[in-house]
Amino acid sequence: MEYVPDAEIWDLYNENRELLGKDHIRGEQLPIDGYHLVVHVWIRNSKGQYLVSQCSANRPTHPLMWECVGGSVVKGEDSLSGAIREAKEEVGVDLMPENGQVLFTKTRKIIEGKIFNDIMDVWRFEYDGEVDLGNATTDEVAQVAWMNREQIKELFDANMFVDTLEYFFTEVDK
C-alpha cells in the first residue's frame, strides 16, 4: 500500500468480522474478501425525536439529501469510538458511550450493483444536549433538525431521505 497524505485508512475484516491485519485506503477498490466497518448513528432525544442532517450541496454522495450521522470506522478504532467521532465531526455533538447501544449489525456485499463490502453497525444514542453545527469539524452537513417518525417518513416519501436508511421504520423506531 502506497502512502497517501491525509488519506482515510481503514482496517480490513473478513466476513466474520475478524481483523485481517491489512489496511485499506478509502476510495480504492476493496478486495473481494475484505470488509470495512461502518456506523450509522441515530441520535434520539427524550421527546422521541431523532437528529437528522441534510448533506451539504458539495458532498459527493447524496447532496442535499437527509440522513442520520454515519461513516467509516478508521484504522485502530472500534465501532463505538467511530460512532462517537462521526457524531462530533458531522453534527458537533459529544455523545456519551454509556448512552449508546448497537441495535443491529448487517454485512453488506453489493448495493445497487456497487461492491460495498462493509459491516454496518447501527447505533442509537440518547441525547438531550445542545446541537451546534459550529462545533462540527467537517462541512459535510448543511443543516440539522430534530424530527419525529412522521416527519422523517414525509422526507423519505418525497425522495429527500437517503433510501438505504429505510430500515429506520422497522429497526430503529419500532
Question: What is each PLM-predicted segment?
Answer:
Residues L37, K47, A57, K88, ...:
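Active-site segment of metal-dependent pyrophosphate-handling enzymes
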Residues L12, I43, V52, R124-F125, ...:
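Conserved hydrophobic "DFG−1" position in protein kinase catalytic cores
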Residues V38-G70:
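A glycine-rich, hydrophobic loop/mini-helix early in the fold
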Residues M1-H40, R44-S46:
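Acidic, metal-coordinating catalytic segment for phosphate/diphosphate chemistry
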Residues L19, G27, P63-L64, K75, ...:
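Nudix hydrolase/Nudix homology domain
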